A protein has these predicted regions:
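Non-catalytic substrate-recognition and accessory regions of acyl/acetyltransferase enzymes
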Residues: 1-79, 83-189
Length: 189
């Protein structure tokens, strides 16, 4: 559980264009361009059912719907593009009956000096139960107790944003009936 709320509300990013397309594997690929038409980021998501018997993600359920973020890449960093993609994923999670649940594997393979675990933690993501060491390090960095160099080598970390695990599946069934009755609302999302 988070010991602190997300640090600050994210201001909306103006003048960006986001294009989405479903690929042949069922994933939804989002591409973002700035006002000049320059490519600034990509996110790939897939609605899934998490079979969580080992509780790699949420400790609250063994099987639940969740949106998997397979890939999130932005450049330049620290401009708000990653946060915009996460906000899109949160909305998309409801649109695809995942009840606001998101999960991913944060990896420092591409940028060991600036690990993504800090970014996801600031946005409200939680660590799984076996990532206690990584969780402590990231929380200490966010609190200003250790320098960023102390985060080097965190590796791969299972992280999740849990809204509603819907253990009995009633919420998913309700949302499917709701979508059939009011499809224009889901087109608007």
């Amino acid at each position: 559980m988070l010991k602190f709320p997300p640090l600050k509300p994210h201001k909306p990013i103006g003048n960006v264009f986001v294009y989405s397309q479903k690929n042949s594997f069922g994933s939804i690929v989002y591409k973002m361009a700035n006002k000049d038409g320059k490519y600034v980021g990509l996110m790939e998501t897939l609605p899934t059912i998490v079979n969580n018997k080992r509780q790699s993600y949420s400790p609250n359920a063994t099987s639940y719907p969740s949106l998997l973020i397979q890939k999130l890449s932005v450049g330049p960093k620290r401009q708000g593009f990653g946060s915009a993609f996460i906000n899109i994923a949160k909305k998309d999670s409801f649109k695809h009956f995942c009840n606001g649940n998101i999960h991913l594997v944060a990896s420092d393979m591409y940028d060991g000096l600036h690990p993504p675990q800090v970014f996801y933690r600031k946005l409200g993501f939680q660590f799984n139960k076996s990532s206690g060491f990584t969780e402590r390090k990231v929380d200490e960095f966010i609190a200003g107790k250790i320098p960023e160099s102390g985060l080097y080598g965190l590796g791969d970390t299972y992280m999740f944003f849990e809204n509603n695990v819907d253990k009995d599946g009633k919420m998913v069934e309700f949302m499917k009936r709701f979508k059939e009755k009011f499809p224009e609302i889901f087109e608007w999302l």
